[in-house]
């Protein structure tokens, strides 16, 4: 149960951080 929760938490964090980094890189390239 704990491993499943941590796995979903990690997946959610990855889905949240990855687009943020992608947008950040795009903004840096635009500037």
Curated annotation (Swiss-Prot):
* GO terms of molecular function: electron transporter, transferring electrons within cytochrome b6/f complex of photosystem II activity
Family designation? Belongs to the PetL family.
Xref: SUPFAM superfamilies: PetL subunit of the cytochrome b6f complex
Question: Which is an annotated Pfam family here?
Answer: PetL
- Origin species, per record, is Hordeum vulgare (Barley)
Q: What is this protein called?
A: Cytochrome b6-f complex subunit 6
Output one GO BP term. photosynthesis
Do you know which InterPro entries this protein is assigned to?
A: Cyt_b6/f_cplx_su6 (IPR007802)
| Role played | Component of the cytochrome b6-f complex, which mediates electron transfer between photosystem II (PSII) and photosystem I (PSI), cyclic electron flow around PSI, and state transitions. PetL is important for photoautotrophic growth as well as for electron transfer efficiency and stability of the cytochrome b6-f complex.
Q: How does it sit in the membrane?
A: Single-pass membrane protein
Quaternary state and interactors: The 4 large subunits of the cytochrome b6-f complex are cytochrome b6, subunit IV (17 kDa polypeptide, PetD), cytochrome f and the Rieske protein, while the 4 small subunits are PetG, PetL, PetM and PetN. The complex functions as a dimer.
The transmembrane segments are 4-24
Q: Name one GO cellular component term.
A: cytochrome b6f complex
- Keywords of this entry: Chloroplast, Electron transport, Membrane, Photosynthesis, Plastid, Thylakoid, Transmembrane, Transmembrane helix, Transport
Where in or outside the cell?
Answer: Plastid, Chloroplast thylakoid membrane
